[in-house]
């Protein structure tokens, strides 16, 4: 069975093949309303082909997506909850300096 990455990489070619097969259908002898509907289908297929190609290109430019598709654990770009809590605790436990204004008197 092909890898997830290989399946994604093959999508534009598979779509291209399917679109070419559909575009190869002859329908010039069809009634006008059918011909119009099939013309709309061709336009939709061409747009789908471009959309899939752009999306696959965009996905394969992202290292985290490629790592996932290859079965690797992607590196965490965001800090973990523990790191964020530790940072928050440190920011609240810093000693005050002499430049801080005195607390307000009530």
From Swiss-Prot:
Location relative to the cell = Host mitochondrion
Give the highest taxon in the source lineage.
Viruses
Q: Which Pfam families does the protein's record reference?
A: B2
Task: Cite the SUPFAM superfamilies for this sequence.
Answer: FHV B2 protein-like
Membrane-crossing residue ranges in chain numbering = none
Region described as RNA-binding: 1-73
Q: What family classification does the UniProt entry report for this protein? A: Belongs to the nodaviridae B2 protein family.
What does the subunit comment say?
Answer: Homodimer. Interacts with RNA-directed RNA polymerase.
What this protein is called in its record is Protein B2
């Amino acid at each position: 069975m092909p890898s997830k990455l290989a399946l994604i990489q093959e999508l534009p070619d598979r779509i291209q093949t399917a679109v070419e097969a559909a575009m190869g259908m002859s329908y010039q002898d069809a009634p006008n309303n059918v011909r119009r509907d099939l013309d709309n289908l061709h336009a939709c297929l061409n747009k789908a082909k471009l959309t899939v190609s752009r999306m696959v290109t965009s996905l394969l430019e992202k290292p985290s997506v490629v790592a996932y598709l290859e079965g690797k654990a992607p590196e965490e770009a965001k800090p973990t909850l523990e790191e964020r809590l530790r940072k928050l605790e440190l920011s609240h436990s810093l000693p005050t300096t002499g430049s801080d204004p005195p607390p307000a008197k009530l």
